[in-house]
Structure formats: C-alpha cells, structure tokens
Curated annotation (Swiss-Prot):
This is Ribosome maturation factor RimP. GO terms for cellular component: cytosol. Coiled coil: none annotated. It is found in: Cytoplasm. It comes from the Bacteria. HAMAP family: RimP.
Length: 151
C-alpha cells in the first residue's frame, strides 16, 4: 500500500526531475525503518542514469522537500536508478514490454482468481490486458494489481 504522502512527494519531485532531463520512476516511503527512508528512483531519458544525475536530483529535491515540510521528522533520502526492475509500473514499461510474458497478481480476487500469466497486450485506465491461450483477458485495476516479468 502506498504511503499517503507519496502523491505529494511525486508532485514535488516530477517537475524537478523534468528540469534535469530525468523521469521519476518510483517513490517509496519506508516508515518501518528508523529513521524512515524515502527512496526515489529516477531515470535519465537520454542516456544511462549516472551518479551525477542522482546527485543533482538529490540536492535539488532535498532543498524543496525541506522547504515544503511534507515530512516533519528526521528521514533518510535515497535517490537511485531503478536498473531493470522485474515490476512494470509506468506507461513506458507497459509499452516497452507489450507482447512479453508477464505475471499479474491481485490484492483481491477477480472472478475467483488472484494470479494470471500471459502475454501482455496493454493497459488503460480500466484494466491490464493479457493474452492467455489465445484469448484476451481484462483484469480490472480496481482489484489492486502487481505486474511483473516472470523469474
């Protein structure tokens, strides 16, 4: 489950990333750690993401975050490149992996099922679409989906 502060964090982070030619690919606030850890994953849109990209984003973002007071207590900020994640999250991921075999799991069962494996056909605002044994199956986003590449 996404921490409630994440949408505000993303709203703050995305313009900073865009100004630097970067894209925010993920944000996680791990409050189970002491101090809590805010992890932001970024990707350079033109080339491989470098340490300089992470450092530039970190400096700009941290200054804005401190000014915003979104996080009231001490925290650790980690900025990194996502590398190749097995999880599909962004629209770019779903376009890049169209036709690839994926595994979809849901938090809540849909039609008595919580896991599907098939060829990714796409995603829209309503569902993720898989081809399973030649048949297109729509799995609604409302059941809480995780989409990943198979191991």
């Amino acid at each position: 489950m996404t921490h409630p502060v994440i949408p505000d964090i993303l709203a703050l982070a995305q313009p900073i990333a865009e100004d630097l030619g970067l894209e925010v690919t993920d944000a996680v606030f791990q409050t189970n750690k002491r101090p809590p850890v805010l992890r932001i994953d970024i990707r350079n849109l033109q080339q491989d993401t470098s340490l300089n990209d992470c450092e530039a984003f970190s400096r700009s973002f941290e200054a804005q975050l401190e000014e915003s007071s979104l996080i009231a207590s001490a925290y650790v900020l980690e900025v990194s490149s996502p590398g190749i994640s097995p999880y599909l999250a962004t629209e770019r991921d779903f376009i890049a992996f169209k036709g690839f075999e994926v595994v979809v799991t849901s938090d809540n069962p849909h039609q008595g099922q919580s896991q599907w494996q098939g060829s990714l056909q796409g995603r829209d605002g309503e569902a993720v679409y898989l081809s399973i044994r030649g048949r297109t199956v729509a799995i609604p986003l409302t059941v809480g989906l995780t989409v990943r590449l198979p191991h």
